[in-house]
Amino acid sequence: MAKENVYSSLGEHRKKFMSWQMRTILVTMIGYAIFYFVRKNFSVAMPGMTAEYGITNKSFGWIIFFGSLTYGFSRFVNGYTVDRYKGRLVMALGLLLCALSNFAFGYGANLSSLITGVDSGPDFINILILVMGVTIIVNQFFQGMGYPPCARILPHWIHPSELATKMSIWNCSHSIGAALAVVVCGYLIGSMGTDLSNNAEVVAAIQGNLDANGVKDAANQALVYAAHIGAWKWCFYVPACLALVGAIGIYIGLRDEPKEVGLPDLPDTGLGGLKDGGMSAARRKKFEAVMVWKNRWVWTFCIANLFVYVVRMGVLDWGPKFLTEARGLDIKSATWTTAAFEIAGIIGTLFAGWATDHFFKGKGHRMCVVCMAGAALFMTIFRFLPADAGITPIAATLVGAGFFIYGPQALIGIELGNQATKEASARANGIAGILGYLGSGLAGLLVGYIADFFGWTAVFETIIVVAIIGMFILISMWKAPRDGYERAASINYNNE
């Protein structure tokens, strides 16, 4: 149905409806981007915490692992919460609580000193890691209150005939938020803090921490970090303040449904016979069994999603750290490079969708194979860059990797909807989401351990292997159909 035909039936309400539609899209995009400001700031703060306290990659890995699992659980729980409460209330409250947890993280060192009575030593560090871990896990639970409200609110304002197009644009919000987060926090950590670079004892302590963690050019890096003691805290304070403002903006700017502002519902979006009971419970159970639980294409996509997330989060979560420690970049250059990886992902996502329709006739799984091969290729180039490679080749290879890895991340969700059909899309994507968050957690755990015990080169090699495995998993479904509607039509309900 053409856009004009869809909205022209709203009559005199059309202009007001379109205004509220644009407002809803913009507010949710900005709001969800701010969620990433109080989520991805941790990645930028990690190098500073290693320098000042000697926190190991293994410890960070465990924090990321449990945080990712908590986020996945929260997304699942809050998917039900938004059906009972106003989506704008859940989203605004979630961002408010994220702001408070970020303030708490910034004061983590003070709290650890209060608990232990000291501000250094093994006991202090252990309590600090515990406090940070608990705070990140709590923050990740509140993070899970961000996406479900958007998934519920937007279909009330956007007609199904253009939902995919506008949601693909909306989906760039997390990439925009993550990119801006690492850039802003990179500036803060390189500009704020107390200058103790003239204190030989402080510089020596920092160099010892960096040497213990295998940081490249530790002597010069120690002077840089000593000039900005405590700057990592600002990576939490500033985004937290932004989140407070964002929470207020979300609550004021959003409305869950058109009727809340005196507008009619979108035409042709009633529940219809299927959701009103047209399919019996027994038939629905069999439908989901065939289209989801016994659908090998669904499971292939879900398993591949785990590998996609390991590659993506292995770079995004750890980028600032391995670029400073393994490649010797300063923190500002490292964060700009990580941001470029994320921005390239936006372009790659849009290109992957376009290429799927124009070159592969809607068969997104084939485009995913190309993307995983591209990601593996660019990570291989990155692995073999010379030790003295400048920022240009380093950034170029990570931009290439980002361009390719974000294609599968977006396409898998769309393709699951096609393979499971729209009636079982949510269930199929739920499974993929759980495995994706597991992959994110494993990326944190694996990278932390491998970096500490085998070095960053082994980390890059692991990411390459994971990308190749993901590619072969997707190759196994090269001959899969474009969608599962023919399969759904052939289900035999006679023996239900």
Language-model features, listed with the residues they occupy:
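Cytoplasmic helix-loop-helix junction between adjacent transmembrane helices
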Residues: 135-174
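Extracytoplasmic gate region of multi-pass secondary transporters
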Residues: 42-46, 295-350, 409, 444
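Residue-level signature of mid-helix packing/kink "hotspots" within the transmembrane helices
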Residues: 40, 68-76, 178-179, 342-350, ...
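Cytoplasmic membrane-interface "Motif A"-like loop-to-helix N-cap segments
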Residues: 84-95, 358-372
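C-terminal ends and interior cores of transmembrane alpha-helices
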Residues: 96-125, 373-387
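C-terminal transmembrane helical hairpin of 12-TM major facilitator-type secondary transporters
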Residues: 362-412
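Glycine-rich segments within core transmembrane alpha-helices of 12-TM secondary carriers
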Residues: 165-193, 345, 433-443
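Juxtamembrane intracellular "pre-TM" segments in multi-pass secondary transporters
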Residues: 7-18, 260-300, 492-496
